[in-house]
């Protein structure tokens, strides 16, 4: 078995955290009152040389919880019709239960301690996941209660861009604005972007960390 703290294994790269890319589409900005309408999750994998790539994915359309607020402006922005039967929507419980199961399996297989949400403007997605978890009464939430990796902040640092589409294009990742604001597409692009930035930092010599003795020779 490889050393769990080795720099080129997933558990050693992010201090025991298992990064999972999440995107949500919603009926507004308030995680407590507004509907969670769509969610996608992509796990990440690391090869033997320490390069990060997207892994497994799950995607669900979600039924608004009872009494959920649906802001017309938010629905116009996402293009989601919550009442369309062709959405094949499931309950918040069903969607999160499946995602949590996938994530817990990844944590175990990669010898990590806990999952951490990777998202673009991550506080938004994190707040909706946490609120839905509380509403459904789901136990054993695998995600850290407040820590996240925000690709908007990382994109500003690495690429000089904070908008997802512009950050992707700057990084050489194709981005189709016609598919944007679909949770599945945005999660896929965010996963590619996060992997590109992590791998670029490694390529530039920023990882593995150099010890003081190695620096001074």
UniProtKB/Swiss-Prot annotation:
* Exonuclease domain segment(s): 20-194
EC assignment: the record states 3.1.13.-
Per its UniProt record, the required cofactor names are: Mg(2+)
GO BP terms: namely: DNA replication proofreading; tRNA processing
Keyword Magnesium present in the record's keywords: the answer is yes
Q: Which annotated residues bind Mg(2+) 2?
A: 23, 25, 181, 186
Q: Which UniProt keywords apply?
A: Exonuclease, Hydrolase, Magnesium, Metal-binding, Nuclease, tRNA processing
* Short name of any one Pfam family annotated for the protein: RNase_T
Root EC class: hydrolase
Q: Which residues form a coiled coil?
A: none
Residues recorded as binding Mg(2+) 1, renumbered to this chain, are: 23
> Which SMART domains does this chain map to?
EXOIII
Q: Which GO terms describe its molecular function?
A: 3'-5' exonuclease activity; magnesium ion binding; nucleic acid binding; RNA exonuclease activity, producing 5'-phosphomonoesters
Q: State the free-text cofactor note.
A: Binds two Mg(2+) per subunit. The active form of the enzyme binds two Mg(2+) ions in its active site. The first Mg(2+) forms only one salt bridge with the protein.
Q: Where is this site: Important for substrate binding and specificity?
A: 29, 77, 124, 146
Active-site residues per Swiss-Prot or TrEMBL entry: 181 (proton donor/acceptor)
Query: Which PANTHER family does the entry link to?
Result: DNA POLYMERASE III SUBUNIT EPSILON, RIBONUCLEASE T
Tell me the subunit arrangement.
Answer: Homodimer.
**HAMAP family documented for this protein:** RNase_T
Instruction: Tell me, in a sentence or two, what this protein's role is.
Output: Trims short 3' overhangs of a variety of RNA species, leaving a one or two nucleotide 3' overhang. Responsible for the end-turnover of tRNA: specifically removes the terminal AMP residue from uncharged tRNA (tRNA-C-C-A). Also appears to be involved in tRNA biosynthesis.
Per its record, how is this protein called by name?
Answer: Ribonuclease T
Q: Which species does this protein come from?
A: Photorhabdus laumondii subsp. laumondii (strain DSM 15139 / CIP 105565 / TT01)
Lineage of the source organism? Bacteria, Pseudomonadati, Pseudomonadota, Gammaproteobacteria, Enterobacterales
